[in-house]
Amino acid sequence: MRWPWSGHDEEKKRNAATRSKRAETANSWTGTLLESRTLVPSVALTVSTVLGLRLYKAYFRRIPTVNHIKPDYFRRRTLFGQVTSVGDADNFRLYHTPGGRLAGWGWLPWKTVPTKREALVKQTVGPVLILWRLRPRRISSDWMLKAIQLHIRIAGVDAPELAHWGREAQPYSKEALDWLTQLILHQRVRVRLYRRDQYDRVVAQVYYRRWFFRQDVGLEMLKMGLATVYEAKSGAEFGDVEQQYRAAEEKAKESRAGMWAKPNLLQRLGGAGTKAPESPREYKSRHTAAEKQKKAAW
């Protein structure tokens, strides 16, 4: 004969057994997770994933434009890339290739640097398709090219000005442009970032490799007499090479290199004087003053 309360006692025993089984299962899972054979690989995977993401963001993520450069990169970081075009004797377009050949640039099919305008434009069709549909007349191929390249202004130097905006070309402006184009166009260079200027260009010191030696593009231009030291009252950037730049300019003047050469007989007969050539800064100041006088006269 069963006792009246025997069913209640059995139910308590079953509940207690269930709780005990659950506790054993939880302890078993905890023990398994805390075992070295499980814990060590889990921690290693987590740490490697976090470090990999940080490494990618810091060194292997492509920076297409100046808007993607973090403020703390200036004066601290360098970027490696390929020159896609040279627009003037002291500035050019750079396609950032983080990691260089070690990261696959130049030999992996999906990591090729476009060298033609059409190929550069195609890279931006996807990102700007919506904008093009909204503003079809405002999205030009020039705008698309700017969306995937960095506009670099060589720091510390000022090259002779080409003809533009109705202004005449300075002597040796074409020679300076041809020299720079031959030196760096479609070549890989490294740029040390200094700042962003008012034209959304990156003012940077530019280096290229000649065999195993690193050469400073700005310094070489000064030695060749194809540029002057940058003399604007504001915005000059030299890093730690200002004295080296000024010494190179003085040496070029003494040796009559490039723009510092004395005019030959034909040039003198054509009206060229023997006074010192007009520097790019003097050229800009002269035209700016003339334009102000013209506006004041109106």
From Swiss-Prot:
EC class name: hydrolase
Entries under SUPFAM superfamilies matching the protein: Staphylococcal nuclease (SSF50199)
One GO location term (cellular component): membrane
Entry annotation: catalytic residues: R153, E161, R201
Residues annotated for Ca(2+) binding in this entry: D158
Listed EC numbers: 3.1.-.-
The protein's name in its UniProt record: Probable endonuclease LCL3
Organismal lineage: Eukaryota, Fungi, Dikarya, Ascomycota, Pezizomycotina
Gene name in the database record: LCL3
